[in-house]
Amino acid sequence: MTLRLGVIGTGAIGQEHIRRCSKVLQGAQVVAVSDINVEGAKAALARIGIDAQVFTDGYQVVKSPDVDALLVTSWDPTHEEFTLAAIAAGKPVFCEKPLAMSAEGCRRIVDAEIKFGQRLVQVGFMRPYDSGYRALKNVITQGEIGEPLMLHCAHRNPTVPESYTTDMAITNTLIHELDVLRWLTEDEYKSVQVVFPRSTSKTHGRLRDPQVVLFETRKGIRIDVEIFVNCAYGYDIQCEVVGENGIARLPEPSAVQMRKDARLSTAILTDWKDRFIAAYDVELQAFINDASAGKLNGPSAWDGYAASVAADACLKAQNSGGVEPIELPQRPAFYR
């Protein structure tokens, strides 16, 4: 059986997912897309080399009888409404992050899904599908380093545009760590503080860069995450877990080591798409398989809500400079 996909939003990530589902993955066919720029959507389909219905309205894609499942890759503020529409239509939906623009919006999606009575939502957190993170989690769950005590993490980008602001370091960048570190430790955040070291000269007036985010979890694990989005040298993701009996590090991406001109060197990636391209493939193939089987298993609406609750506390901590509580309600039995 081929899963017939409708894609809402044909911007950069939407086009990547259309290409991926049409040319790389198995078991799915993109049959409909929507975008406010119809001509741009048609041009994107032509470049990718597929034929699909093109709508101006995402709701038309949701309601189409030719569409079995949905990918929401539209403008961030529209994610909530299209995800809610998919739930109402009883169709599985893969929603790129953010699930909604606020924790309250995420909670509305959670409540709608619980009321429907079936898991229909997967959030686009790809890091749990990365082979390096999976290997690191296996080391932890197998008890090879004992109980985790501390995590030292970094999220570094070579540069960001001037439209990128201080709060986006949380909502656009740290949001990935907020999800994957919960998954990695199987723990919830208790509190957070954000501190600002000396700023790099490469930043601009609306961005304080770098930032260091300090978490305590309910089990007492201490986590520090460095966010440095103008590091200049490349795209670099680091994660070190300090356990009772040893230390485990996230493996570096595979790269050729060169001995040349009296130097030993290994290239560092500069683009996030290259760093996690395989994880995107695994993530979407899992969604296709699960949606076809009628049971989703990936990052849930509750995971999207939990990340949003933590992000809101981080934003508050950016402004207060103090330690802010992260108050996540008990996980509903529906998501256990």
UniProtKB/Swiss-Prot annotation:
Catalysed transformations (reactions): myo-inositol + NAD(+) = scyllo-inosose + NADH + H(+)
Molecular-function annotations in GO: inositol 2-dehydrogenase (NAD+) activity; nucleotide binding
Keyword hit for Oxidoreductase: yes
Pfam family name, one: GFO_IDH_MocA_C
Coiled coil: none
Enzyme Commission code: 1.1.1.18
GO BP of this protein: inositol catabolic process
HAMAP family on file: IolG
Subunit field text: Homotetramer.
Known function: Involved in the oxidation of myo-inositol (MI) to 2-keto-myo-inositol (2KMI or 2-inosose).
Record protein name field: Inositol 2-dehydrogenase
Name of the gene encoding the protein in the UniProt record: iolG
